[in-house]
């Protein structure tokens, strides 16, 4: 799969799960393969009540397949990204990606907008580039966050939380 040179300029104001400026959700990715999302730009503001929200991608899910490789190359977000959710599953918000399952590489990504995750009933996690990532072998190179990042729980200028960070 490849998604390249896409631009969103429209605001997104509704949505309850997996909301992204370019891609909301891609899942059921079993077996070997690579997903490349490159040179994509979001200029729209996203203000929703969803639980996986990102300026470029809401949720990319390979269901724990170690043979899945996800690449985010030179993706830029200029919009303000926020979710105010009552979801019991948690709220994950990122300038580029809200929630990422699998081995991911982030290269040359930038976030310029504010990123905010708030929840009344569960964890809220925010990252300037990625809110939550499962795989501890993922990498970030030449990524910069210029925006304010806020959340109730885990907050990171680049990454809010790594789920499986152990040896």
Predicted regions: what they are:
Residues 1-167:
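Predominantly extracellular beta-rich ligand-binding scaffolds that present long acidic/polar faces
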């Amino acid at each position: 799969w490849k998604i390249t040179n896409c631009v969103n300029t429209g605001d997104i104001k509704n949505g309850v799960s997996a909301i992204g400026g370019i891609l909301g959700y891609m899942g059921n990715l079993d077996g070997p393969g690579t997903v490349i999302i490159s040179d994509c730009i979001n200029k729209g503001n996203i203000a929703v009540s969803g639980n996986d929200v990102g300026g470029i991608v809401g949720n990319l899910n390979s269901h724990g397949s170690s043979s899945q490789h996800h690449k985010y190359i030179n993706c830029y977000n200029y919009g303000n990204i926020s979710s105010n959710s009552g979801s019991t599953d948690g709220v994950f918000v990122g300038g580029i990606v809200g929630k990422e399952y699998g081995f991911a590489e982030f290269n040359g990504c930038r976030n310029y907008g504010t990123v905010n995750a708030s929840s009344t009933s569960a964890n809220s996690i925010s990252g300037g580039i990625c809110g939550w990532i499962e795989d501890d072998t993922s990498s970030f190179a030449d990524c910069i966050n210029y925006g304010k990042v806020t959340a109730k729980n885990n907050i990171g200028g680049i990454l809010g939380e790594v789920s499986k960070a152990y040896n």
